[in-house]
């Protein structure tokens, strides 16, 4: 999984430029030779108009509306529900997965607050 933020660090690395640790993106150039190499467990995306935040893994998509999910959450198993019709967030059987994603989202939102624009 990759993010658009990975483009600049990757192009910089391919050009032989030094890594900039203040950037949020990651160098994914190794994936050009090793397609199965992973650089991140989940891809992160933001929908500003809806104040939504997405974490996407290979099998799962988690969407949180509002900084703490106060406006709702959605959880989809994209392997069995690729069109994301069935929200599993309220299902007790999926509570551990939902909790894991909520923890990941809290950590991700805290990490992006300390971004390259502040340095």
Regions found by a protein language model. Name each.
Residues 2, 92-95:
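Soluble non-cytosolic domains of exported or imported proteins
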Residues 5-8, 13-74, 78, 83, ...:
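C-terminal cap/loop subdomain of S1 sulfatases and analogous C-terminal strand-loop tails that border
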Residues 87-90:
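Phosphate-coordinating loops and pocket residues in cytosolic domains that bind phosphorylated ligands
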């Amino acid at each position: 999984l990759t993010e658009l933020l990975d483009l600049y660090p990757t192009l910089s690395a391919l050009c032989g430029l030094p890594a900039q640790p203040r950037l949020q993106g990651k160098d994914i150039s190794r994936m050009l030779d090793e397609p199965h190499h992973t650089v991140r467990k989940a891809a992160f995306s933001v929908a500003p108009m809806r104040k939504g935040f997405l974490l996407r893994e290979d099998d799962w998509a988690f969407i949180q509306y509002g900084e703490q999910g106060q406006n709702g959450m959605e959880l989809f198993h994209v392997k069995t529900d690729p069109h994301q019709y069935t929200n599993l967030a309220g299902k007790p059987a999926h509570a551990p997965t939902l909790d894991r994603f909520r923890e990941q989202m809290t950590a991700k939102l805290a990490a992006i607050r300390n971004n390259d624009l502040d340095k």
